[in-house]
Amino acid sequence: MPTISQLVRKPRKAKRTKSKVPALESCPQKRGVCTRVYTTTPKKPNSALRKVARVRLTNGYEVSSYIGGEGHNLQEHSVVLIRGGRVKDLPGVRYHTVRGSLDTAGVKDRKQARSKYGSKRPKSA
């Protein structure tokens, strides 16, 4: 354990925390172009076909991004907006595509949590 005078001479160094979303480079979102759109299976014990896009970002990074919601219109060369947020049962997927911005359409017939899926308010009957 150091003495007070040792700490005065050389203070303690704060631990630097590693970013969970390094490709965003401290930005809230980044734009990119889809290089591949595919489905993949989650880790045990879950079972599904999760929709994922491989995206080349404007800063040169290439990342995997999850496409949330039911149905999507993305294909190769689609321009998408990426935000942080991992998918727990898909290893290596640390980003989400933002629905309802750029080339990504919002989810059709969405009634609840619409802002997360880029859906407009339905007309009341």
UniProtKB/Swiss-Prot annotation:
Q: Which GO terms describe its molecular function?
A: rRNA binding; structural constituent of ribosome; tRNA binding
**Which GO BP terms, alphabetically?**
translation
Q: Where is this region: Disordered?
A: 1-24, 101-125
Read off the CDD domains from this record: Ribosomal_S12
Q: Which Pfam families match?
A: Ribosom_S12_S23
Skewed-composition ranges (Basic residues): 9-19, 113-125
The lineage's top-level taxon is Bacteria
Cysteine pairs forming cystine bridges in this chain are: none
**Which ranges form a coiled coil?**
none
The yes or no answer to whether the keyword Acetylation is present is no
Q: Which residues carry this modification: 3-methylthioaspartic acid?
A: D89
The record's section on HAMAP family has:
Ribosomal_uS12_B (MF_00403_B)
Q: Family membership, please give it.
A: Belongs to the universal ribosomal protein uS12 family.
Q: What job does the chain carry out?
A: With S4 and S5 plays an important role in translational accuracy.
Protein name from the UniProt record: Small ribosomal subunit protein uS12
Q: Which gene encodes it?
A: rpsL
